[in-house]
Amino acid sequence: MIDERFKSQTAHNLPGDELSIAKTDRRVETVNSNVPADERLKFVEGGAEFLERIEPLWKQQTALHAEKSAHFAESFTTANFSDRKRVFEQKARAGSLLVILAIVGPDEIAGYTVCSVCEELSDLGTRKVGEIDSMFILASYRRLGIGRKFLLRCTQWFEQNHAEKVITLVAVGNEEVLEFYRLAGLLPRAILLERKDQTD
């Protein structure tokens, strides 16, 4: 169940904000329209065509996971964006993919999130599973509500795409984000154990 605090805090913007949604092939939401254009924050939505733009931030996220990982730091330091991009593209082909960029000024990406809806085969049959695949916000832009806006939009998108189950993976060492995801009703369910090979 979604925390009511999450609904009330994310359904509105910061005081004085005004929103506008451009009627184009992708959704554009502008926040803080009362400030100069070069300082304005906007949210832009697209699909796999946006993946190249998230690479620098994805690498920062991976480096952060490497710092925090107690057992599998090497798997993060050797991670390759091209491989991850292929996974995202496969999800786009097999189901649906949403990429949201938080952009400051003309073209500075302050954060991004990638989510998907794909079919999953289980003992109960086939069902649609929504997943928050990746989310990262630059440190200088945290505590501004960007993550909450990402989370709200992902939740809406999952509902629009009839996801019957919603998941996200949290790396060990990054447990501080559990409370954030709890706001959207995402709760810890299992702990995955993986054998550490000698090469890791």
Question: Model-predicted segments: where are they?
Answer:
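A short helix-loop-beta-strand connector motif used in the catalytic cores of GNAT acetyltransferases and
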Residues: R86-I100, E131
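Conserved N-terminal entry element of GNAT/NAT acetyltransferase domains
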Residues: M1-N13, D17-E52
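A conserved beta-turn-beta hairpin within the catalytic core of GNAT-like acetyltransferases
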Residues: E119-I132, R142, R189
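Conserved active-site alpha-helix within GNAT-family acetyltransferase domains
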Residues: R148, V172-A190
